[in-house]
Amino acid sequence: MKIVVLEKQVPDSTEITVDKKTGALVRDGVPAITNPDDLAGLEAALEIKDKNPDTEVVVMTMGLPKAADMLKQGVAMGADKGVLLTDRVLGGSDTCATSIALAAALKKVGFDLVIAGRQAIDGDTAQVGPQTAERLGIPQVTYVDEIIDVNDESITVKKSLEDVEQIVKVKLPCVITTLSEMNTPRYMQCDNIVDLCKENKIETLTNADLGVDPNRVGFKGSPTSVKTTFTKDVTDKTETFTLSEQETADMIAKTLKEKQIITK
C-alpha cells in the first residue's frame, strides 16, 4: 500500500502578527511549524506502516523551497520520502488552485490512500482535502479521529461530529482528513536522520513536471482571494475577592447563571 500524506508549513500561531496597513500576515521572523492536523495524519500513516512494514509513506507539500525542511522532519519521523511542489507559477494559489496542483502531483506519484489534515491553522478553510478528492474523482471521509481498520481494498474509520460518532467504511483509493486530537505524533528517529544525511529523499516537482496549465494555478487560477486578515484584540480583566468558602461558591454559581453557563 502507498500512503501519501499532505502537509502544510504554517507560521506558529502563538507568535503571529498582522500588518495593520495591508491586513497581511507578517511571516518574516516567525517560526514555521508543520500544521498540527497534518502531523496527526502523518502519525496515522506511520502507525499503519508499523503494522504493515511493506507500506510506503510519502509526505507531500506545496510551498517555498524552505518547506523541504518540514518534509525532512516527516522522513526523520519514519516516512519513506518527501515530495515538494515548488514553482513561482504556483505562488498565490487559493484552495481551489492548490487542489488542482496537488491532484496532478498525486496522479504522478501514485497512491492508494491520501491523508490530509482537517484544516490549516493559518487559514482554517478545511477545503484542500475535500477539493483534492473531488479533483481526483475518489471518495472522501473528513473529520476522522480514529482509523479502525485498513487493508488493500478498504479503510474503516471513526469520525466525530458535534453530537454523534460515525463509523465509515470506504473503498480505496480515497482521501481522509484527520484531527490533531486523534494521536500524539512520534519524535524524529536518529537512524532516519542519519539516513537523510547520506541520501537525498526529497523529490522536487515544478509545475512543468505536473503538466498543469499555468492559468489554472497561482494568482491567475485562483477564483478567491483574502481581502483582509486580523487578530482579535484580547483584554485581560482580573478581579480579586476575599471571601469565605460558602461566599465563594455562591458567587461562582451566580456568575455562571448570569452567563447562562448553568441554569439551575
Labelled PLM ranges:
Residues 1-264:
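N-terminal glycine-rich FAD/FM-binding segment characteristic of electron-transfer flavoproteins
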